[in-house]
């Protein structure tokens, strides 16, 4: 099993890294005594549910448990697990500024200044830093760049910029989906609802699909909307967005929006982008 030990200075970005790992399916535990690492790893390894790995946070809050970690790590390695230590760091100036912005006291000292806390923390974690597989200096990174760097380490460069799309149809009659990032209203298209033989069918039916897609206005709309998506998706990815919900709506969510979502699915498939499709209101119309 792959084991990631997440460590580093307070305010350097560990919490952001853990959230990224949780999104990738890692089993994450914060502030666990190092002596319990082998037990947790063994339990997760024996569980029925498959996970890509375990991420364990180890920092100054567990100062009483920092001793003897090298022996524990060797025990984990001897058990056949791949252990990686990712250490997050930043300059003193940047850390001081971050603490000032959040108005938090430094967790390393009950009393004393933030600079004193940083110096003490560096000293306490120096041995762990020396063992690090990777040191990430976040001084010049924004949160999106940090997410990309963590993903690049976890999934490889090819996976760092992958985006998952949730493409869904809906009916305005039942309200706009609250989770939507992009909403497209296609009620301007000809409505199969008013064709007697098509009314009882859905947009999954070839007859309804042909009725909707063969109209010139549909062809023009798809060309423009797909062009917009080709522009927007890389921009969203540059900002660190890994999951995008696109909602396509018609009156009842049964005919036009369903047919268009299925056609857009093919667009994403051709582009090699992972897509999840759902039809929220198809059975209501």
UniProtKB/Swiss-Prot annotation:
<keyword id="KW-0547">Nucleotide-binding</keyword>
<feature type="binding site">
    <location>
        <begin position="8"/>
        <end position="15"/>
    </location>
    <ligand>
        <name>ATP</name>
    </ligand>
</feature>
<feature type="binding site">
    <location>
        <begin position="59"/>
        <end position="62"/>
    </location>
    <ligand>
        <name>GTP</name>
    </ligand>
</feature>
<dbReference type="InterPro" id="IPR053930">
    <property type="entry name" value="RapZ-like_N"/>
</dbReference>
<dbReference type="Pfam" id="PF03668">
    <property type="entry name" value="RapZ-like_N"/>
</dbReference>
<comment type="function">
    <text>Displays ATPase and GTPase activities.</text>
</comment>
<dbReference type="Pfam" id="PF22740">
    <property type="entry name" value="PapZ_C"/>
</dbReference>
<protein>
    <recommendedName>
        <fullName>Nucleotide-binding protein Gmet_1286</fullName>
    </recommendedName>
</protein>
<keyword id="KW-0342">GTP-binding</keyword>
<dbReference type="InterPro" id="IPR027417">
    <property type="entry name" value="P-loop_NTPase"/>
</dbReference>
<dbReference type="InterPro" id="IPR005337">
    <property type="entry name" value="RapZ-like"/>
</dbReference>
<dbReference type="GO" id="GO:0005524">
    <property type="term" value="F:ATP binding"/>
</dbReference>
<keyword id="KW-0067">ATP-binding</keyword>
<comment type="similarity">
    <text>Belongs to the RapZ-like family.</text>
</comment>
<dbReference type="InterPro" id="IPR053931">
    <property type="entry name" value="RapZ_C"/>
</dbReference>
<dbReference type="GO" id="GO:0005525">
    <property type="term" value="F:GTP binding"/>
</dbReference>
């Amino acid at each position: 099993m792959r084991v990631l030990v997440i460590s580093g200075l307070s305010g350097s970005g560990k919490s952001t890294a853990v959230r990224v790992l949780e999104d990738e399916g890692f089993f994450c535990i914060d502030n666990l005594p190092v002596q319990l690492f082998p037990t947790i790893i063994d339990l997760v390894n024996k569980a029925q549910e498959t996970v890509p790995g375990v991420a364990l946070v180890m920092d100054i809050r567990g100062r009483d448990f920092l001793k003897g970690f090298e022996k524990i790590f060797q025990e984990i390695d001897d058990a056949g697990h791949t252990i990686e230590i990712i250490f997050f760091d930043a300059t003193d100036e940047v850390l001081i500024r971050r603490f000032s912005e959040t108005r938090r006291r430094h967790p390393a000292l009950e009393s004393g200044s933030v600079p004193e806390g940083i110096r003490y923390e560096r000293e306490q974690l120096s041995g762990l830093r020396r063992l690090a597989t990777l040191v990430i200096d976040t001084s010049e990174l924004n949160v999106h760049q940090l997410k990309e760097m963590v993903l690049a380490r976890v999934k490889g460069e090819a996976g760092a910029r992958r985006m998952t799309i949730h493409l869904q149809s809906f009916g305005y009659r039942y309200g706009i989906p609250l989770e939507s990032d992009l909403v497209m209203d296609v009620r301007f298209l000809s409505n199969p609802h008013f064709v007697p033989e098509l009314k009882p069918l859905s947009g999954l039916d070839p007859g309804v699909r042909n009725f909707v897609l063969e109209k010139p206005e549909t062809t023009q709309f798809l060309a423009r909307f797909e062009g917009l998506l080709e522009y927007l998706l890389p921009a969203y990815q540059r900002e660190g967005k890994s999951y995008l919900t696109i909602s396509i709506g018609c009156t009842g969510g049964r005919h036009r929006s369903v047919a268009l979502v299925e056609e857009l699915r093919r667009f994403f498939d051709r582009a090699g982008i992972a897509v999840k499709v759902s039809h929220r209101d198809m059975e209501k119309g």
